[in-house]
Amino acid sequence: MNLILFGPPGAGKGTQAEILINKYNIIQISTGDMLREEVKLGTELGKTAKSIMDKGDLVSDEIIISMIEKRIIKPDCKNGFILDGFPRTLKQAIDLDNILNKLDIHIDKVIEINVDEDFLLKRITKRALGSKITRDDDNSEILKNRIVVYKKDTLPVLEYYKNLNKLHTIDGMQNIEDVSKDIQKVLTWL
């Protein structure tokens, strides 16, 4: 089972991915986590990515595509994977399809967790205040920019997957359990 999870920052993609990982024994491929790890390690890629992410902008397609291609061929992806935070642009979606076709892999479902902006701001603020571990991008100014970038760059990707009859939209303003149940309903058709 190969899935893509979409949703604006703070929509709960990571939480839902964790549930799916445990239920289906698949792995999560999070470009955000991969990039944060590079930043933490202080690699050249990490330094470049940090300067871009600190502004709330997207890291270049070339960097992300290269990371994903290397990751997707690892043995732990054989049972399936969830892409979280990728693809974010139409070019990335097309490049992903090209990579997957070359590897004889396909995406089964694309799930969008839909949440409105006010709800996101409240959720992210709560996450930042209630956590001992803070993320540099958990503040309202950066979040607002990330939402603008998400809408501008990512919404055309949703249309792309809708045209391929792979997109399923879930109400992300429900509690975690109900969002998960709605996702499970979509996946029962696999």
Task: State what each model feature region is.
Residues 1-190:
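Glycine-rich phosphate-binding loop of ATP-dependent small-molecule kinases
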